[in-house]
A protein has these predicted regions:
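Compact nucleic-acid interaction/catalytic patches
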Residues: 17-73
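C-terminal terminal-subdomain/extension
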Residues: 62-141
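Short, basic/aromatic recognition patches
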Residues: 14
Length: 141
């Protein structure tokens, strides 16, 4: 059973490009049941990614939608030591009965709050208008 703030590894899922992805980490940001267009889910998560090297880290952290992972804010076992980031602009909706996953760690409340705030800011500025367009351009370009 996963809950808010847990870091999980999902055995397999379909990525935003529609391709199957194996063994990937996520942080749970909502653990309440709901439906989207007739499809049920019972938790929402953001994908976590590792940095390949310093150049990759610099490139990925230029995007304001990527939140760096502060390793001292994560507690658990089976963690890699690469360092990484969370994609705050991608939400994945899962049904626990339809996927295999395991909880490997949890995120402290401070980092989780920072992630939730970033998601809310991104959501607020996703609408149309010149300010939203400027922010979107800054975030995604």
């Amino acid at each position: 059973m996963c809950k808010l703030g847990d870091i999980i590894v999902v055995k397999e899922y379909f990525g935003s490009d529609g391709k199957k992805v194996n063994q990937h980490s996520f942080v749970v940001i909502n653990d309440e049941k709901d439906m989207i267009e007739g499809l049920s889910y019972d938790f929402v998560a953001n994908v976590m990614l590792s940095f390949h090297d310093k150049k990759h880290k610099t490139k990925k952290l230029k995007y304001k939608s990527n939140l760096p992972i502060k390793e001292e804010k994560i507690t658990g076992k089976d963690l890699n030591d690469k360092g990484g980031y969370i994609r705050a602009d991608e939400l994945y909706y899962f049904n626990k009965e339809k996927i295999e996953y395991k909880v490997i760690a949890y995120m402290d409340h401070e980092l989780l709050d920072e992630l939730i705030q970033l998601i809310l800011i991104l959501h607020e500025f996703r609408d149309t208008g010149p300010v939203a367009k400027e922010l979107r351009d800054e975030i995604w370009n």
